[in-house]
Regions:
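Short, well-structured N-terminal submotif of metal-dependent ribonuclease cores
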Residues: 1-41, 55-70, 113, 123, ...
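Alpha-helix capping/helix-boundary segments
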Residues: 10, 45, 86, 106, ...
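General small-molecule cofactor/ligand-binding pocket signal
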Residues: 40, 80, 133
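Active-site regions of enzymes building and remodeling cell-envelope glycoconjugates
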Residues: 127-133
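Hydrophobic alpha-helical segments
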Residues: 22, 39-42, 87, 105-107
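ABC-type ATPase nucleotide-binding domain
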Residues: 52
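Active-site neighborhoods of divalent-metal-dependent phosphate/nucleic-acid chemistry enzymes
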Residues: 59-65, 74-120
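Phosphate/NTP-binding elements of NTP-utilizing enzymes
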Residues: 49
Length: 133
């Protein structure tokens, strides 16, 4: 059973820059890994990765499709699709929520699935209407 949803940058840090994680985030991710317990990842995060690579904000040493496939096939990651329920929830987050559509979908995904979101995003953290690590 999935209990946590990873924000896009958290997955990157988990795999490449572990020191960027807070102590609480690192502890939770290590526990998940030790227990073989998967974390959720919104499908929109795959697009965010593709755009980061396209804009050269991150670099990878394999073709993009192969890299994204490796995320999908990772037993510690469960990709959660965008559903009509999540789309509707993303529109209900309110005017005080950040305008980034990807962040809206990620938070709506966590809310619809009853998951705790692991994020360092300040806008989401300030909103403070969801369980966070």
């Amino acid at each position: 059973m999935i209990s946590y949803l990873l924000d896009t940058h958290i997955l990157l840090w988990w795999r490449t820059e572990f020191r960027q994680l807070s102590k609480a985030q690192a502890r939770v991710l290590q526990e998940l890994e030790d227990q073989g317990q998967p974390a959720g990842l919104s499908a929109i995060s795959l697009r965010e990765f593709a755009m980061m690579i396209h804009r050269r904000r991150i670099s990878i040493d394999t073709p993009l499709d192969t890299w994204l496939d490796s995320i999908e096939s990772n037993p510690l990651i469960t990709i959660l699709p965008l559903t009509p329920k999540i789309a509707a929830e993303s529109g209900r987050l309110g005017d005080d929520f950040p305008r980034d559509p990807a962040d809206q979908i990620i938070v709506a995904t966590a809310r619809c699935h009853g998951l705790t979101l692991i994020t360092a995003d300040e806008g989401i953290r300030k909103w403070n209407k969801i369980k966070l690590v």
